[in-house]
Amino acid sequence: MAYSYTEKKRIRKSFAELPTVMDIPYLLSIQVDSYEQFLQEHKKPKARENTGLQAAYSSIFPIESHSGNAELQFVEYYLGTPEFDERECILRGSTFAAPMRVKIRLIIKDKDSKDKDSKAAIKDIREQSVYMGEMPLMTANGTFIINGTERVIVSQLHRSPGVFFDHDKGKSHSSGKVLYNARIIPYRGSWLDFEFDAKDLVFARIDRRRKLLASIILRALGLSTSEILDLFFDKVRVYKGEEQFEIDLVADRLRGEMAQFDIVTPAGDVVVEQGKRINARRIRQLEEAGMTKISIPDEYLYERILAEDIIVNDEVIARANTLIDHELLVKLSAFEASESIKEFSILFTNDIDQGSYIADTLRADSTSSREEALIEIYKVMRPGEPPTVETAEKLFDSMFFNADRYDLSNVGRMKFNRRLGLDFVDTDDADIQRERSVLTNADIVNVLKELIEIRNGRGEVDDIDHLGNRRIRSVGEMAENQFRVGLVRVERAVKERLSSAESDNLSPQDLINSKPVAAAVKEFFGSSQLSQFMDQNNPLSEVTHKRRVSALGPGGLTRERAGFEVRDVHDTHYGRVCPIETPEGPNIGLINSLATFAKTNSFGFLETPYRRVVDGKVTDVIEYLSAIEEVGTVIAQADSPVTADGALSDEMVSVRSYGEFVRMPPEKVTHMDVSPSQVVSVAAGLIPFLEHDDANRALMGSNMQRQAVPTLRADKPLVGTGMERHVARDSGVCVIAKRGGVIEDVDASRVVVRVNEDEMIAGEAGIDIYNLVKYTRSNQNTCINQRIIVNQGDAIAVGDILADGPSTDLGELALGQNIRIAFMPWNGYNFEDSILLSEKVVKEDRFTTIHIQELTCVARDTKLGTEEITADIPNVGEAALSSLDEAGIVYIGAEVDAGDILVGKVTPKGETQLTPEEKLLRAIFGEKAADVKDTSLRVPTSSKGTVIDVQVFTRDGVEKDARARAIEKSQLDSYRKDLKEELRIFEEAARGRIGNLLDGQKVSGGSGLKAGTVMALADMKDMSLETLLDIQPVEEEISERLTQIAEYLVDKQKDIDVKFAEKKRKLTAGDDLQHGVQKIVKVYLAVKRRIQPGDKMAGRHGNKGVVSRIMPVEDMPYDENGNTVDIVLNPLGVPSRMNIGQVLETHLGMAAKGLGEKIDGMLKSQAAIKDLRDFLDKIYNQVGGEQVDLDSLSDDDIMALADNLRAGVPMGTAVFDGARESQVKDLLELAGMDRDGQQTLYDGRTGQKFDRKVTVGYMYMLKLNHLVDDKMHARSTGSYSLVTQQPLGGKAQFGGQRFGEMEVWALEAYGATYTLQEMLTVKSDDVEGRTRMYKNIVDGEQYMDPGMPESFNVLTKEIKSLGINIELKQSN
């Protein structure tokens, strides 16, 4: 295989034995693709599909006025370019969005013209482009910048629209009878439910309101009683015989029934005795006897139901749906032969599988006409309003049959038709989709029929947790819904104004007010439950956050209501949703993560890839199947043994079929998994030896990796899974080459690439410049910094990594550090998961992290005057102002401590009203200090650091201070320098290209050259660029290419001038600040945090703990070679937790390190390159796993590789396809260590040998974002609660420790009266006592004088508020 530039620098040894069938897809596609479909900004307006914005506009427009004489039509929309780029938006606290304009056509029709459709009827057409507000844009990494913060819109997993059949599991009724129900859920609109009650009547509910008989809905659809009976029942003809009634013999209807009378053949033989079950043999006997009719006794007809009206001589004897009784039969027999009834029909019902539910419901129904039914529905939906037939009809029609109010959506229609066994053809035609989006009479009847089938015992209820019944709603779809809501509001307002459009000569711009649209969009992105502040701890947490799938949110579940079933792992989750990664706590199971290979289809259902298997042979065809399509397939595991030609080799293969694991012959297999890791999510896929960890611990492991803080120097994991590279690449934190080429120039802040000839666009200079992000703050206050990993002259290809971001090392995710650990108890310092750490780790800065804090100072307009940012602060000593400049703002580079002033600010005080004389004196002598108070921005308590950046934003129209001007100048200078440098690089590249083009060419003149001169590179070295461009070569093609280059350079110069002018305009213009804000100063503090006792650390297997002590190196255990251990972990943390993966990781890590040391030894002793190759071949190709083609690497590559392997050979043990125990032992042996992976250790304090051998190795440890610095807190005096006057609580309020009820009991138990009194009075809420106490302490007196606690006053006031007078009597 070919290795990329970064991969060959450090090849990870893979233990995978299964072939790679498909690459891991782009991890952020669920976000990026969804929003791209919503905006369709790169498509021409005419080529846009009917989705996203296009669909929203099309569904609302055209808008017609009430009178019908004016109409607004939508033509097209287009997005402008955003005012600020992403970086500027974050700095300024603004939204990264593009202005959206819509071309709208206003058509005014002629009222008097009779013919509505003809062209003559149109009086006037006005077309105009209307501004519709700003539309937030997605950054390249799938995030949005809203008000200066990066946010992610989490996808929602909600119940798919369609029809669902369910039952109450026997919980609704005391008898425990199972009651079935059906529910039609539209995408938007009213829900329609049908349900049985305990008496087997069918009821309907609309929007979960009061229930109605289902027959009322059927009548409202315009069906009569007999039509309803025809739809739901088969009929049985009853004939009047000589002596008895007879019925037709229909074999299928009799099978399984109990005979209610003797069935006798014409010959008089009894075939079926009364009370015996009719089986197939007896039916055969009846058919053989040639019987077509059976005689029945009258009793058989009792309680049967008439299927039609019985009419004699125009008189209705009995209505349809009447129960037959003795009287009716007597009546029928009584008629004269001439007018008697020869035959009639009854409904075919029985107690086994043909219930008379609808007939019973009809009988219970008091309504008899459509009008009555509509009014009944109206009464339920609009109680208290007087119903009329017109309003009732309008309401019922708008609820289910009007496309503006009811939308089943394409997905809903697909699910609806599939569930009811009707055909569904997907189409892009908007009109057909709109037509199909409403219900029809047939739909409602079909749902009822299916419900009755299920009640009759034929058919299954649905499983609502099946992923075929839950779909994903991504960013684009949710944004579209919000946008449509805004447009509907606009539509209402426009309809009002449209009528007067002609008379007032209005244009589309006057008619449309885009505020509701802008507000709806802003509200969605700014404050929706699913628009979340991005978790930016490290690259993994970013990727995971974008791949998260939540069942919560608007239109979803709530934590309280969600039961156990919704949260549980379902068999359809396989390959779609990760069974491991989910939060602990109340959200468990409601928030999930997408599996590695999962993606959504056009309907929003999750799909997972499988290889197609035909006749027991595995093909290379990959099919994505949704949970719906997976039903009925037989899927083999990814590790099923396969022969060389792709045939499944086992006689019986372990497969999944209908959610069960079974064994089947290869011929029956239809599909096969593509990879063993397709079950898990990205975070779980980063855990090596995951298959050896208990699921609960794996869950913690995958969650804690997201909390790892990027360390100062990233260190790739020695034991990884091979997933690291994918996460780092797709997270967007690295700089990735867009085109291949050679590194032209490189420094700490940018990379310049000279692009390969074949990847260039004609006429361009072929230069790509990549600027790096340096020391910026992330959402979680960690540090984002990119570091170059390429050198000048390196050849790179598309997709190569040029610079590492935070937590990446040579293009691989590196969340923590490889640390030498030992599993042993050590003096109780690792009791209860504590971690004992060596001072060496602190000295080497292994777990040192940089945190950047943003502090903001705002100068506002107050009622008493304007706040001022200044260095002239009253009553503050010189020392406190030492690090401020003349504008009152701290210098960059200043080291500041808690309480130091960062920005000096004074606010006017308004206590005293000045007399005119005083005002005059003030004005003359400028004595200002008296009327202002100090409100400077200070470093918060428990913080200190270095100022690394200052930003000043000034309101438009307010004069900028010296500091703001200086910042502006330095930014412009640096930008100008960058642009000049950019131009220089382009010109250099152009020179190079011109030289190559002209080399060996004849010229016809120009630049003072004689015609016929042959150019040589050496001659052109000293020529200027202008001279070169003047040369006129003989060959026309060359001449054309020179002209192209010249034009390109002119364009580039123009482009650079425009860029500079634009930047200058942005910088010099005032900032758009909130109302009343004059100036904002942002100060960025960088803090270096070393690891210390109290910090939380963890491995990748859920093995977490808190640092208990940092020991001197000399006291730590050491081995025979004098190597000390860095961390001592408690061995008791392994057995009960069942995460054995950490032990295997430790052993494999030790082997990796040992091999690295061997390579280091070879390099130091300058071993021959052949020996190096042989040793590397042993490591990579002799101990199992994927083979590495070392022959394809040059000697220089081998040396570079060996140099990078000195610290250890990185291993990749993929999930479910990783290293086996024997392989780990072989590698330990190859590294020259004991196969058991244990060593003899000595006590650092005494030098004595420990009794037993100890497991020592290398584990990848993470430092989590739960730092003791952020949690430690102490208070002397501080703020008090307003009412109770008790100290506030919590670090944020600078609060105290609560001395609670139980602590009081403890003091009471020991009779510590004075301590108790002190706690309840002066240390808490006794205001006077506090003051006296303070005075006493200052005076050096040692006594306490407690008063009345304020909470006692509060209590007396509360009792008084109940109307009970309470007075305190003073005893002395």
Swiss-Prot record:
Keyword annotations: DNA-directed RNA polymerase, Nucleotidyltransferase, Transcription, Transferase
EC number: 2.7.7.6
Keyword Transcription annotated: yes
Database matches in SUPFAM superfamilies: beta and beta-prime subunits of DNA dependent RNA-polymerase
Stored CDD domains: RNA_pol_B_RPB2
GO biological process annotation, one example: DNA-templated transcription
Gene Ontology, cellular component aspect: DNA-directed RNA polymerase complex
Taxonomy, superkingdom: Bacteria
GO-annotated molecular function: DNA binding; DNA-directed RNA polymerase activity; ribonucleoside binding
Pfam families: RNA_pol_Rpb2_1 (PF04563), RNA_pol_Rpb2_2 (PF04561), RNA_pol_Rpb2_3 (PF04565), RNA_pol_Rpb2_45 (PF10385), RNA_pol_Rpb2_6 (PF00562), RNA_pol_Rpb2_7 (PF04560)
Catalytic activity as recorded in UniProt: RNA(n) + a ribonucleoside 5'-triphosphate = RNA(n+1) + diphosphate
Subunit composition and interactions: The RNAP catalytic core consists of 2 alpha, 1 beta, 1 beta' and 1 omega subunit. When a sigma factor is associated with the core the holoenzyme is formed, which can initiate transcription.
PANTHER family: DNA-DIRECTED RNA POLYMERASE I SUBUNIT 2
Protein function: DNA-dependent RNA polymerase catalyzes the transcription of DNA into RNA using the four ribonucleoside triphosphates as substrates.
Family: Belongs to the RNA polymerase beta chain family.
Name of the protein this chain belongs to: DNA-directed RNA polymerase subunit beta
Protein species of origin: Psychrobacter cryohalolentis (strain ATCC BAA-1226 / DSM 17306 / VKM B-2378 / K5)
